[in-house]
Amino acid sequence: MNTGVIWFRNALRLNDNRVLVECLNSTNSQTILPLYILDKSDLEQNNNENRIKFLYESLIDLDANFKAKFGSNLIVLNGKSRDIFRKLLDSDLLDLSEIFTDYSNKPDDIENENNLKSILAENVSVKLHLISKVNSLTNVQEVVSQENFKPPKTMKDMEKLFSNLYPKDEDGFYSIDEPLDIPENSKPIYDNSSEIIKDYLFDAKKELS
């Protein structure tokens, strides 16, 4: 069966998560593989102790919620994302059909995406879906690509930008999208992944103990 990867990056939650919704609604994959990838050496070099602790606690919480909802664990991996996806794509045990993740303009995320796109150029049957409006209210790509777009510098600029995107209700509030519920539909979790990526498995609970 074809498998779709849910690559959690910046939205470590189940509710209001378009990446999760899009993957579960896709007809191109019958099983899912939920991943979070970190590089511990980079993480420790570029973040303080409190930020790292918060990330680990968030991963533990997401894992508990994922298990309660879908009956399986979030898979947390330590390593370079390009190496991990290469391992997944090269495995004969996995029929990977698509990868879902959130759109991001963070330099590290863009670099990881470009590395992944280079790998996928050799595996054209696997599609990468960058889902917008996960970490922002707007589709950033669409907004900045508009012909007359100028980066907002003041609150008045922000108000003008939002006025062009969202109508106001009778009380003068912007009518933005409602938060997405945790999907009721589900797919089986691909359960042979540990054999493929066992060298990268990471235990956030152990790191906090």
Annotated model-derived regions:
Residues 1-71:
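N-terminal beta-strand-loop-alpha-helix module at the start
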Residues 33, 73-77, 127-131:
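General small-molecule cofactor/ligand-binding pocket signal
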Residues 38-43, 80-81, 104-106, 131-138:
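Short beta-alpha junction loops
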Residues 95-109:
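Acidic beta-strand-to-loop metal/phosphate-binding motif
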Residues 109-118:
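Short Gly/Thr/Asp-enriched flexible loops that form oxyanion-binding sites at enzyme active sites
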